[in-house]
Amino acid sequence: MHVLDVVSRAPETGLDMKRCRVLVVNDYASMGGAEVVYQQSADLLSRLPGVEVERFDDTRFPVGTTKWSRSWNIAAARALEETIVGFRPHRVMVHNYHNALSNSILSVIARQKRKLGFRAYHTSHDYHLVYYNPALQYFDKRRPVILPLEMLGTRAALTHRSTTKGLVHDLMTKCYWHAVREAFPPTEIFETIVCPSAFMEEALHRSGITNTRVVFNPSSVPVALQPSSAAGRQRFKIAFVGRISQEKGLAEFIELAESVNFHRIDVIGVYGDGPDRRAMERRFTSLIERGKVVFFGRLPQEELFPQMRRFADAVVVPSLGAENAPLVIIEAAMLGLPALVHDGGSMASTGDAVGNKIKFRSQPESLKLALDRLAMHLADKGRRYSLAEYLPEHYQQRLAEIMELGEQAGTAPSRRTDEAVC
């Protein structure tokens, strides 16, 4: 293991100078998939020998409530700078920042990198580095459409509406995006940008960002279970897991299922909450009354996964956006469940090697065919899923290699002369 040069504790700070300090940053402590990965990364890095981890999220700064503070959160930038100065990290891993933290933190990271000599990394959960809309969507008559990667950097990408809030707002969004990109080039702020999918890496490369490494997000289900069997059954229980909002495509999937008279679908169970839940409960009242759609609400993970295993024969990922690396596909496989996946964006390729994906498009015949394939898949008692690359220990090892931590620490010279360097 790499030996740190200084073995004393700095009296003025109370910091353990023998340990490599890693600051892990994210917009929110808890909300969605990115937050789960944020917490997992902090936990897994903290288990590496000689590594000390500190978290920074919305529990330590005020989230902006105005357009200005959401675009440039000065309070968040100040809080992050105070944390960096006090903690004196050797490594900084930034997950999502474009929502609550805002681009204001980029100036802090750039400035403190010059002063302290730490290395900074970013896990790109969303598409904010490559397009004006972080979901990689544009709007055609208010209808969301996934932007093809071939359009990145072209005139078409510039002219498409990236928001539904009007022309002026769209133009201001694009001007702001380009200004931030010019002032804080991602390749200069971050040593390496971690991509949870090959699709994200391709998007970054097409946008001129090439300092990337693909690292699959770790499953929240620690142990793979035996794949479930539904041999002889003709109708199946399908689970949706996630945020109930427009871009997740749940309403469209329910309508599509209704258009094929719930072909092979016994019931759709919805795990999660979100801004569209009440409207959807009103919209699908008759289906709820008939028991074809059930809303279970949001559950903690320790309750969610066992209940999914008991309830579902398969999960559905009907997202309208490009997504990136939807963990639910992998978590379903860990629970022994196949996944019906909308064929678009990163979802078209994420987890292909796992063996539990069945793709469908937004047409009735495509869904019917996918459900017939699901029946055959579930009837296969000998099926196995390949999950080694999604296990937490694999994720931990890959991060340690990229960030040069613990036994993976390198010997590259550092500009830090005030204390131990990992």
Placement of each model-derived feature along the sequence:
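Acidic anion/phosphate-binding donor-loop and adjacent secondary structure
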Residues: 7-9, 205-206, 210-236, 408
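A conserved mid-protein helix/loop that constitutes part of the nucleotide-sugar donor-binding site
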Residues: 35-40, 236, 240-259, 275-278
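Membrane-proximal helix-turn-helix segments that form the acceptor-binding/catalytic region
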Residues: 128, 139-192, 202
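Nucleotide-activated donor-binding/catalytic signature segment of Leloir-type glycosyltransferases, i.e.
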Residues: 281-299
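Acidic donor-binding loop of glycosyltransferase active sites
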Residues: 309-324
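Short hydrophobic beta-strand element within catalytic cores of glycosyltransferases
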Residues: 314, 338-341
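Conserved acidic donor-binding segment of nucleotide-sugar-dependent glycosyltransferases
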Residues: 354-365, 372-377
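A charged, aromatic-enriched C-terminal amphipathic alpha-helix characteristic of glycosyltransferases
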Residues: 376-413
